[in-house]
A protein has these predicted regions:
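Short loop/turn segments that connect beta-strands within beta-propeller blades
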Residues: 12-16, 58-62, 102-106, 155-159
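Short beta-strand elements that form the blades of beta-propeller/WD-repeat-like
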Residues: 1-4, 9, 44-50, 81-92, ...
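Surface-exposed loop and turn segments in beta-propeller and other repeat-based domains
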Residues: 19-31, 106-129, 162-167
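Blade-loop segments of beta-propeller domains
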Residues: 7-11, 16-51
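Aromatic (tryptophan-biased) beta-strands that constitute blades/sheets of beta-rich domains
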Residues: 1, 18-21, 45-47, 65-66, ...
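Short coil-to-beta transitions that initiate beta-strands within beta-rich domains
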Residues: 26-38, 70-72, 124-137
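Asp-box/WD-like beta-propeller blade repeats and closely related beta-sheet repeat scaffolds
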Residues: 31-35, 49-97, 107-123
Length: 167
């Protein structure tokens, strides 16, 4: 699946176009902007983060439902019933780094942001690339690797567990 201005496009493993999976619009099951996507191969579902919500679809494009999520930079799945959202510390003063939210939009847990800094008034600090992934799923585990951190973490409902330290 590839998100683009035309929607969420599905391709075969060898690169052949299959279809446009979902529709942009303001109606039920439609998105206004694709901020980020995730997929669950086992459940055969895809998830689109769209300003304050996550829309769920089947691989075939059928609308399943919607969940509310606080504004996040990226997200990934945590098991079958929760999401992990990454809060980018662009002001230097964000209190939280990650937020865990269930499918009903209830906050389950947050993980603090320890990297606090001061920047000139009215400015934001961005150090990222368009294809950077701070959160991702690997073997059905949620993982987090920040741009300026040497540690890859596994995210559990209770804590961040160091998984790898990169030299």
């Amino acid at each position: 699946f590839i998100p683009c201005s035309e929607g969420l496009l599905q391709f075969t493993d060898d690169g052949k176009f299959v279809r446009s999976v979902v529709k942009r619009g303001q109606g039920p099951g439609e998105y206004s902007i694709i901020r980020f996507i995730a997929a669950n191969d086992r459940l055969k579902q895809i998830y689109i983060m769209d300003n304050g919500r996550i829309l769920t679809y089947t691989i075939g494009g059928d609308y399943v439902g919607e969940s509310k999520i606080p504004f996040c930079w990226q997200f990934t799945l945590l098991g079958d019933s929760a999401y992990v959202g990454y809060i980018y510390n662009n002001t230097g003063q964000k209190k939280d780094r990650l937020v865990l939210v269930d499918r009903q939009g209830e906050t389950l847990n947050t993980f603090p942001q320890y990297d606090q800094f001061t920047i000139a008034n009215g400015l934001n600090y961005y150090l990222w690339g368009y294809y950077d992934r701070y959160l991702y799923s690997f073997r059905e585990e949620a993982c987090c690797k920040e741009y300026y951190n040497d540690t890859v973490f596994t995210v559990t409902p209770e804590r961040l567990e160091p998984r790898y330290i990169l030299d």
